[in-house]
Design a protein with these regions (language model features):
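Acyl-donor (CoA/ACP) binding surface of acyl/acetyltransferases
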Residues: 1-26, 30-35, 70-184
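Conserved GNAT-fold acetyl-CoA-binding loop/helix
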Residues: 36-58
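A short hydrophobic/aromatic micro-motif that marks alpha-helical segments and, especially, helix-coil
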Residues: 48-50, 63, 163
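A short helix-loop-beta-strand connector motif used in the catalytic cores of GNAT acetyltransferases and
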Residues: 57-72, 81
């Protein structure tokens, strides 16, 4: 495996690229301030665009490292979501993603995720990619299923929603390198 970092990736409709601080307004307006989008995430909605800009400054600096994988999902030049490896352990990684609510249900996240999996397995050489979702967010699970991630188990009350303080069950899914190439 050879780390290659956040390279620009293209699909039929999307360009996936590293974030810059210039994305702050679009990120804030499209999802960072939206309570519905951030409900199942590990961070609360941003209160203002400066909070978003500060986060993007960190992400922009981190993206210079070859072992960091964090993409801005863009559609016709507009930043509409993000997809990242939130944990890398050797040749295994855990992904996380979110998308502007106005683009839900259009196959965009599945398209972006499929391209990232292609890159991670074919070009970088990862062995295993996993992800998880709150049981009450089945749409996220459908994205994973469409992209070949198999159900591995449910952890009971393993995630506390920041919005309500309630504990939620988490579903884990993963795809192995050999599973990925068997599907192709």
């Amino acid at each position: 495996m050879e780390h290659k970092g956040t390279k620009i990736l293209k699909t039929q409709r999307l360009v996936l690229r590293p974030f810059t601080t210039a994305d702050a307004e679009a990120m804030f307006e499209n999802w960072a301030n939206d309570k519905e989008v951030t409900k199942f995430l590990t961070w609360t909605p941003h209160r203002n665009v400066e909070e978003t800009r500060a986060l993007l400054a960190v992400w922009e600096e981190e993206s210079k490292r070859p072992d960091v994988y964090h993409w801005a999902i863009t559609l016709q030049g507009e930043v509409i979501g993000d997809l990242a490896l939130v944990a890398v352990r050797g040749e295994n990684a855990h992904t996380g993603y979110c998308l502007s609510r106005k683009f839900w249900g259009k196959g965009i996240m599945s398209e972006a995720y499929a391209e990232v999996l292609r890159y991670l397995f074919k070009e970088v050489g990862f062995h295993r990619i996993e992800s998880s979702h709150v049981v009450n967010n089945p749409a996220s699970g459908r994205v994973m299923e469409k992209c070949g991630l198999r159900y591995e188990g449910t952890m009971r009350k393993a995630f506390r929603l920041l919005s309500t303080g309630e504990w939620e069950d988490i579903v884990y899914r993963a795809v192995l390198e050999e599973d990925y190439f068997d599907r192709k």
